[in-house]
From Swiss-Prot:
Keywords: Protein biosynthesis, Transferase. GO terms for molecular function: methionyl-tRNA formyltransferase activity. It comes from the Bacteria. This is Methionyl-tRNA formyltransferase. It comes from Paracidovorax citrulli (strain AAC00-1). The gene is fmt.
Length: 329
């Protein structure tokens, strides 16, 4: 069975590697154009492109796929390449471009998507982040038959996994990437023998995982400690949770909600205690939900992530200071 693969980041690279290791024939890979990255802002190929080139696979990088859109020439060239590949199916994983109907209709078996959630929960661009932010106890991967909607297609395979209490997007991403790679191999094996059954998504339980914006990084100390903790973990590694101390931005990479209420009269964001174990900060929230958040890993703008004891030696913090707002560093 010939498979066209469309994907861009590390999550997708893992799936492509799994398919190739399983013996899949992949004549063509679609991925996003090279982007400037790093301190020198030099053009860098996506992880999927790097993988494809390492395996001698042809790569197409259209800027768009709409034949009547802004990048019609790119779309026409991509269509010619897709038709020439003569694939039976397309596997899509975090590609980054909307697939128009002509793409969905081209492969004999259609387009299969690897989605990092238990659909219909967390349709959309950031299912891993939003699951952690919401405090979900479990998530998983769904292999979906793509249609014209936003992650609305029929479910082909689905597998659950628990979200660990201190899970971050970084750690959960890696586990789901591995799970997605295993499931897509299983799906293609079933498809080859006609054993892949489709189940429509239920109408109940639909939620949307909207794209993470850098502006979300600012910590709102009026939220309960547990909610802030979830956001810190959800926004690791991007965009990072941050707060202002005087005129300086500090990123918070590690924290722990303490099971104690803040002292009476403490305002949200007020530093209550400072030692090598952590910086304790008063949080807000409704009666009974307010608490104290202990900050354990911090980073100054342009610096490295540091355990709080090391951070304090170069950046003293003291009880009575008030943290607030924040912007991405």
């Amino acid at each position: 069975m010939k498979i066209i693969f469309a994907g861009t980041p590390e999550f997708a690279r893992v799936a492509l590697e799994r398919l190739l290791a399983a013996g899949a024939e992949v004549p063509l890979v679609l991925t996003q154009p090279d982007r400037p990255a790093g301190r020198g802002m030099k053009l860098q190929a996506s992880p999927v492109k790097q993988c494809a080139l390492a395996h001698g696979i042809a790569v197409a990088q259209p800027r768009g796929l709409r034949l009547d859109g802004r990048y019609a020439e790119d779309a026409a060239a991509a269509r010619a390449a897709l038709e020439a590949a003569g694939a039976d199916a397309m596997v899509v994983a975090a590609y980054g471009l909307i697939l128009p109907q002509w793409v969905l209709d081209l492969p004999r078996l259609g387009c299969l998507n690897i989605h990092a959630s238990l659909l219909p929960r967390w349709r959309g661009a950031a299912p891993i982040h939003r699951a952690i932010e919401a405090g979900d106890a479990e998530t998983g991967v769904t292999i979906m038959q793509m249609d014209a909607g936003l992650d609305t297609g029929a479910m082909l395979l689905i597998e659950k996994t628990a979200i660990a209490p201190r899970e971050t997007t970084a750690t959960l991403h890696d586990r789901l990437a591995d799970l997605g790679g295993r499931l897509i191999v299983e799906a293609m094996e079933l498809a080859a023998c006609g054993g892949l059954a489709a189940t429509p998504q239920p109408a109940e339980g639909v939620t949307y995982a909207h794209k993470i914006e850098k502006a979300e990084s600012a910590i709102d100390w009026k939220l309960p400690a547990a909610a802030i903790d979830r956001r810190v973990r959800a926004f690791d590694p991007f965009p990072g949770a941050s707060t202002q101390c005087s005129a300086e931005t500090i990123k918070v990479w590690g924290c722990e909600p303490l099971q104690v209420p803040p002292p009476e009269g403490a305002q949200p964001g007020e530093i209550l205690q400072v030692d090598d174990a952590g910086v304790d900060v008063a949080c807000g929230g409704p009666d009974g939900a307010a608490g104290v958040l202990r900050l354990t890993v911090l980073q100054r703008a342009g610096g490295k992530r540091l355990p709080v004891g090391d951070f304090l030696r170069g950046h003293p913090l003291a009880p009575g200071m008030v943290l607030g707002g924040g912007a991405g560093a």
